[in-house]
Each structure stands twice: as structure tokens, then as C-alpha cells.
Amino acid sequence: MSNVLDLVDQTFFRLEQAAGVGQCVWVYNRPVDIDGLRRFHQHLQHGRLARRIERSALPFGRHRWVAPRDQRELEIATPRPREEFDAWLGEQANIRLDAEHGPGWHLATLPFTDGGAGVSFVVTHCLTDGVGGCLALVEAACGYDHTINLPAAGSRPRWRALREDARQTARDIPGIRRALVAAAAAARSARRHHGSASNPAPAPIAGADELVTLPAAAFFLDADEWDARAQSLGGTSNTLLAGLAARLAQRVGRVGVDGSVALAIPVNERTADDTRANAVTMVDITVDPAPATTDLREIRAATKRALIRHREVPDERQTLLPLIPLVPQRMIKRMVGVATGGATNVVVSSNIGAAPPAVNRPDGTDADHVALLSRYPDLTKTMTRQLGGLMVVHSACVERQVFVSILAYQPGRLTSNDELQQHVSRVLSDFSLTATMGWPCSEPVGGGAVGDPTI
């Protein structure tokens, strides 16, 4: 089995901080079994995430997967009140992860001084996507070591590395030629559509570029209520999530000039024994968010048409990927949209679906709540201006409980957790859904008019 990186994975690696991280969060309303959590951690160390990236010996070559030299220990944090859990999760998301030098992931637990505990698992997107991460967690929870036979880092003599990487580049030449033809055609098409005028570049930000703290929220719903609401609106779980995402985007102004919302829906393409880190492609649809609260049939139809088109027509973005190893790093930074959906003003709506129950058992027993969040801890003001903001919505169903997590930032419209929670509460009310917001899970929101005590 080849250890050469897939071109999508090489793209994420070259995007560096814009690639982002995934964070899986568990909450226990009782103490965590530390011994069980240590076993979980040990199996992760011998699972599908036990690898790192070694750069090619050629400046334009394909990188390779190698075995890690060492791995970080389980972190047991100093106890804090549960109300500080969100702040701690943000600190965990900010831990420096490095797919090349390690660590590529980190597991930690926070005991609550007022009872219970939380667990955080963060992993760089360079190592896995959501489905791959879910598989790694399930395998570790079940005590399964998914050992990948990889060479040690630095094990190839330089002459051998140069020879092997040159041969790989030679094998890639036909794809590079096709990509050059496609890139030229795309450039001609852009000139025809936009004429000689070009969009003005964003004004540079004065002084040093600054990091942006992205608002995040998570809420939980009963799976039967979620499914019933989707069915009553003529949709599915996928289209209900897309409808929620579209309405939230509408509320914060993340829309096109005609008021439409551009949704990017990840499609899982992972196969058995797939070694790719990111085995997904994006399906793009444009929807009118206005009728979503009463009728999801148009979103459902648009999704179906897009999936058919995806199977029949090659994705232009995939065709261009063979050029990635050849592109200078200064130009790679302009491709930040690849990691967040592929277009400006896009909204990513990702539904993993029904996850195996074992994903909720990091210490060997069921947690009370589990959720997956996207994080971009190193996103800067320049990047957010380039993207026009950011919105990523995730969902899955675990043991008849649906979680929805949101990471969103809209310059001038949505810049804080409080603002995001207010928008989420109103959107849930629009859909007549009752949800439990946040990790304490004590006060339901939605399902009534704003200000109603039943919210």
C-alpha cells in the first residue's frame, strides 16, 4: 500500500493553519473513569491516526505518511467549575497541533468542581475528516488497534527519496497536463464573464494581522422530534440541517445579492481500508432560505439534483489538484477557501448521520452528551475578509440524541458567542424545535416566541 499523500490531503497540509481542527467533546454528569480513558488513549496511539507527514525531498514533490516517533500523554486538567467548560474547550482547540512534527491530536479531560467531567479530543484536519475521526474514536472505544504499516520518519536515504519522489512526479505528469488545460479554460471563462475588470482586492489591514476568535455553539435535540419535524416539512435529516443553516445564514447576512444562500454539503467517499485523511468531496447548492421553515421540498430537490450532477460531472476543483505540489506557498494562502467549502460566502452543512453508539464511550461507558465541532484557531482577520466570514454547521445522531454544532463569524454582524446563541434560539423557534443549549443542558431553547418562558 502506497504511503504517498492523496492530493486533497497535500492541499490541506499546505494550507497550514487554514486547514483547521476537529474537536470531539463529551460531557459526563459523573466522574470519568480515568483508567478507561487511558485505555482509550492507548488505542488511539495505535490506531489510524498514529501517523505523521514527511515532506518530499523535492520542492514540488508529493509528501508521504510516516510513523510517529513519539506521542503525547493523556492530559488530566486541574478541576474547574462546569461554567468554565467552554473556555477550557477553546484552550484545547488552541493547542498547537502539527501533522509534520507532532502531535497531530490531543486527548484531555477536565473534572468539574461541581460534579461530572468533560473530555476533549482535538485533531488536525491534515490527519482526518469527520467520518475518519469518528471511525478512529469508535475503534479506540472498542479496543481495536488499527495498525498502519508505515516507514519511520527519515528512514529513506536522501538519494533514494529523490529517486522515488521523482518517479512519483513523473507518474503525476498526465494529471498535471490535464490540470493545466483545465486551469487555462477556467481563466478564459472568468475573463469572458467578468471582462477586463477585476474585483478590487480587499484593503490591507493596518499593522500586524490579528487572530480572530470565532463564535461557537452546540445544542441537543431529541432524535424523534428532529425526524418528525423533518418529515412534516417534506424533508430529511440532511435537508432539515441544511434549512437550519440557510436560515441562520440569512439572519446574519451571509447571503448572495439575491438573498440566496450557497450551501456546501460534504459527501463521504471513504471506502474500506481507505488511508486518505480527507475522503470527502463537496456538493454545492444554492437555496432560498425564506420557505425553509414551512417547506423543505425545494432544498431536498436541489440536493438530489446536485448529487446526481456530482456523480455524472467531474468536479473542476478535483481536476486542478495535481497542480497543488507545484504552486508556490505564497499563492497557496490565496486558496484558503478549499478548506472551508471552496467559495466565498459559502455555508458548510455537514451531517454525519447515525453514528455508532461506541463513539459516545471514551472511558468505556456512555457519556451524557457528545458533539463534534469545527475549529479554526489560527484564522486571521485577513483570512476572514478573504472568505467574507465563516459558517460551518455539523450534526450527527448518537443513541437517539441529535447534536448540532455551529462555528460562525460574520464581520460586523456576528462576532460573539452571545450573538450566535441569540440567532440560534430564534432560528430554532422559526422551525418549532425545542433544543437544549450548551453543555450544562439545563435550559431548553426554541419552540416558542422569543421571550416565552417555555423557550
Residue ranges and their predicted role:
Residues 445-455:
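Long, low-complexity, intrinsically disordered segments
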Residues 15-21, 113, 275-278, 397-400:
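Short, flexible turn/loop "capping" segments at secondary-structure junctions
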Residues 2, 26-46, 54-387, 412-418, ...:
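Soluble acyl-CoA-dependent acyltransferase catalytic core bearing the H(X)4D motif
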Residues 1-31:
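Short, Lys/Arg-rich amphipathic segments at extreme N-termini
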Residues 21, 388-390:
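Short beta-strand-initiation
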Residues 282-285, 392-397:
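Short beta-strand elements
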